[in-house]
Amino acid sequence: MDFPILSKKIRKAQLLVFFDLEATQINHQAIAFALTAYKKEKDQLIFSDKDPINYFNYIRTNDEIGPIVEEMTGITKDTLTEKGKSLHEVILDISKLLRHFKDRCFISYGNLDIEILNRSIDHNNETEENFLRNITKNYFNFQQYLYERIVDKNGSALSIHKFAEKYNIKEEGKKHDPCYDSLVLKDTYLSYIKEKEKTLSFIFENYSHNRAMTSINKALTMKVLEEGKAEKDDLIHLLEEYL
């Protein structure tokens, strides 16, 4: 099976929900929520990106946005006052939008989005608490998955925008726009799977700096000890089992 580890995380889902939040600078209170969701067949990784379910809204907050966040996102207090909804309303919107799909997988790039939700919801409100619990239960951190396979020359994780460059992904919009970032996340997911040769080349690029490859290195060492040699194809085969 191609991408066996990824398949275990994704295959049961009927709906893949790629989402991104923006938050205030200091207290990480949610100020914008975007998602793009796609129906797929069970036991499949790939889906058609036609007829997506899209959602975006600003979220009102009493917290200070912060100058750095305002500069990066273009979101101001006036934006939230004029265009924002309460987080509770946003949660109701999203719940209604996705209600027909029992098996969902929520995908973001890094668990900061989960932390933002955790900091922002009213934990005494059953609707909001259940919303967070449902996402957390069915959550896949795509950043962590990629970090265990593809790193930079310093052994560090790549940003989602760096992956967009590597896979030559083009979407309208700009960084730190949650609609744009959600689409880039979806495109990166699809490119990672569809462009397998390119993906393997990215893994090889800084393979020696990837601390997560310990198990692969041990398996390769065992092959050398048992057979006296190991070829590049042996490494590729081991890596394919790790995808």
What residue ranges belong to the model's regions?
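Short acidic, Gly/Ser-rich segments with clustered Asp/Glu that frequently serve as metal-coordination loops
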Residues: L21-H28
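N-terminal accessory regions of nucleic-acid-interacting proteins
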Residues: M1-F19
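A generic local structural motif
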Residues: D2-I5, I91-S95
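Metal-dependent phosphoesterase core characteristic of DEDDh/y 3'-5' exonuclease domains
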Residues: Q14, H28-A32, T36-T73, L98-K229
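Acidic catalytic cores of enzymes that act on phosphate-bearing nucleotides/polynucleotides
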Residues: V224-L243
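Metal-dependent phosphoesterase signature
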Residues: M72-D93
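Generic marker of residues within folded, mature protein domains
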Residues: K8-K9, Q25, F47
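Broad, structure-driven detector of short, well-ordered beta-strand segments within folded domains
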Residues: F19-L21, Y38
